[in-house]
């Protein structure tokens, strides 16, 4: 388990990771050879084929401190403690999604049971664009793998403070959505600037909900960022924030599409750069997310990550098409300035939290839209957060989906926080029943993650 006191030391205000010599590593593979969005889609069957071949060819499964685990099929119950579907989850979730989630759960179990020090789930389909409400597929994602895994970890092992560090090139707007109102889950994403790449989100003002200011850290990086920039952000910004947050466990959403050869982005990171990034982070669990340079990047990036997590030498991991490139001076200056702005905002988080509540009594409301690019669904939402002076309140979503294969769908979903006491839980159910009496939506659902699970009202 991640320990900020033992794993990190502070020098001149910068936190650097110390290494555990040859930690044991669990690997879980689920390449989902029977699932694809389409035959030519980037998220297709052979995405992990070359990675598996590379790992076998390098003999990594024969290394004494590396152990392979089989995925499981995740139960519907644990998925429904995170997600609400329209018209229902079964309309969108396949067996492949349940096994992908189950692969992450198997990795977590191996670590939390003390069988290995760390684990890496190389699974697909990916999940970090999947939000709590599911009207279809967006950003290749339907179920949020890490979110369901975290629910399992909390429910089974009693872990409280969790940090997610998302190293995918795309902002993980789904993970942000699930945990935006949870002050005990720190979500950090550094990604290509949303003004230049899908999903167009992930900016500094997305700092967490009104009762969780500072629990959401979005670091939008300029196109052309290379190893130098990513490692600087990790050392000077991400690690110090983790040190202050003091998580019980750290999870890496290990997207690999920052690689210089990835066809869907414009970054300049190498396999060795990824390995060093992972070495600095010292995550307990890594879960594969994006990465679509199937032959030129994924086999080498994954090999580097495995070697790094197992405490082995990764200095010889070099892609066949590698050409040394240097990050431009303009990109470096931009990143330096961004780090300074973030340090200032992080230091002012309590002041920002107070300002956020000005004008709100016991409720905070926002309206926004979500587009499901793979399913053609346009969703309109009204989100309401119940504010208490001394505890975490529930939040609800009135969700209206239009177009797509199921035409018009509407759901009222009440989300009870996992930290809820009996009084909060009772009030949430009362509010959901009141909303149903008013009518107007197809379904009324309460999600009680540490209690009854998902309940139809």
Model region roles, listed by residue range:
Residues 2-165, 170-457:
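HDAC/HDAC-like amidohydrolase catalytic core signature
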């Amino acid at each position: 388990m991640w320990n900020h006191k033992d794993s990190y030391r502070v020098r001149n205000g910068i936190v650097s990771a110390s290494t555990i010599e040859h930690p044991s590593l669990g690997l879980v593979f689920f390449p989902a050879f029977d699932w694809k969005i389409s035959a030519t889609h980037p998220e297709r069957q052979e995405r992990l084929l070359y990675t598996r071949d590379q790992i076998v060819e390098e003999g990594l499964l024969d290394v004494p401190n590396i152990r392979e685990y089989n995925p499981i099929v995740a139960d519907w119950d644990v998925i429904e403690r995170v997600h609400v579907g329209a018209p229902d989850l079964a309309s969108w979730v396949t067996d492949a999604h349940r096994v992908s989630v189950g692969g992450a759960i198997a990795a977590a179990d191996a670590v939390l049971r003390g069988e290995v020090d760390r684990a890496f789930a190389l699974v697909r389909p990916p999940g970090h664009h999947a939000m709590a409400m599911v009207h279809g597929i967006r950003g290749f994602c339907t179920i949020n793998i890490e979110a369901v895994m975290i629910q399992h970890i909390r429910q089974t092992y009693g872990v409280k403070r969790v940090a997610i560090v998302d190293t995918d090139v795309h902002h993980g707007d789904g993970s942000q959505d699930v945990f935006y109102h949870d002050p005990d889950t720190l979500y950090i994403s550094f990604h290509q600037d949303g003004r230049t790449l899908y999903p167009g989100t992930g900016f500094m003002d997305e700092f967490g909900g009104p009762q969780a200011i500072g629990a959401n850290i979005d670091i939008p990086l300029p196109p052309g960022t290379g190893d130098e920039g990513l490692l600087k952000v990790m050392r000077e910004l991400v690690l110090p924030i983790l040190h202050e947050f003091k998580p019980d466990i750290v999870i890496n959403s290990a997207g690999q599409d920052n690689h210089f050869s990835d066809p869907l982005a414009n970054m300049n990171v190498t396999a060795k750069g990824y390995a060093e990034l992972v070495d600095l982070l010292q995550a307990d669990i890594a879960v594969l997310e994006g990465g679509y340079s199937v032959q030129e990047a994924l086999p080498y990036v994954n090999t580097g990550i495995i070697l790094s997590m197992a405490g082995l030498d990764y200095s010889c991991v070099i892609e066949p098409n590698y050409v040394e490139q240097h990050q431009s001076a303009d990109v470096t200056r931009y990143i330096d300035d961004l780090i300074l702005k973030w340090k200032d905002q992080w230091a002012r988080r309590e002041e920002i939290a107070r300002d956020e509540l000005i004008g709100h009594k016991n409720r905070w409301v926002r309206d926004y839209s979500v587009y499901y690019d793979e399913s053609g669904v346009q969703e309109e939402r009204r989100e309401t957060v119940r504010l208490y002076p001394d505890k975490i309140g529930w939040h609800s979503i009135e969700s209206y989906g239009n177009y797509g294969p199921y035409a018009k769908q509407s759901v009222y979903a009440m989300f009870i926080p996992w930290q809820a006491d009996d009084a909060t839980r009772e009030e949430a159910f009362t509010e959901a029943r009141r909303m149903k009496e008013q009518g107007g939506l197809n379904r009324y659902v309460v999600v009680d993650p540490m209690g009854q699970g998902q309940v139809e009202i």
